[in-house]
Swiss-Prot record:
Alphabetized UniProt keyword annotations: Ribonucleoprotein, Ribosomal protein, RNA-binding, rRNA-binding
Gene3D superfamilies reported in the protein's UniProt record: Ribosomal protein L6, alpha-beta domain (3.90.930.12)
GO BP terms, alphabetized: cytoplasmic translation
Protein family according to the UniProt entry: Belongs to the universal ribosomal protein uL6 family.
Stored Pfam families: Ribosomal_L6
Name listed for the protein in its UniProt record: Large ribosomal subunit protein uL6
Function according to Swiss-Prot or TrEMBL: This protein binds to the 23S rRNA, and is important in its secondary structure. It is located near the subunit interface in the base of the L7/L12 stalk, and near the tRNA binding site of the peptidyltransferase center.
Encoding gene per record: rplF
Subunit text: Part of the 50S ribosomal subunit.
Amino acid sequence: MSRIGKMPISLSNQAKIEISDANVKVTGPKGTLEQALVAQVTLQEENGVVTVQRVDETKKSKAMHGLYRMLISNMVEGVTKGFTRKLEIAGVGYRAELKNDLLALTLGYSHMIYFKAPDSIKIEVPDQTTILISGIDKALVGQVAAKIRSFRKPEPYRGKGIKYEGEVIRRKEGKAAGK
């Protein structure tokens, strides 16, 4: 049995879950999330605890069991607490600022890069070298953070670029001087 899939999901008193045949809907103080279900898994809710079970023992069912348990767990956490990713900008002259609802990035190119986040994602810029991305959908928060990071990935020689908080950049030695 899947070690992740067999763990129950406890609902806080703030989160409500609605289970139908084809999808599951989780509602909380921060918003509502919906997820389509596959035929290989079934959900049961009793006394504020949701359990995910698979219908048979095929390889596909075993794979879906753990996946859907984590997806639903992330939905519950998202509508109650929310998710945040922090990006750090390193480099001379590299900076970020918020102009209306656009994120304006100066990253050493000949032009500025403007990024508009999806409606459910909130972007904050506490200072010029820090970007905070928050929302209720964990996958979407990560996707937006990865998209912003892709504008200037950290390079290994000087470490300039956009990196996740706590990310360690493997540094390389420059060319050795020849004779």
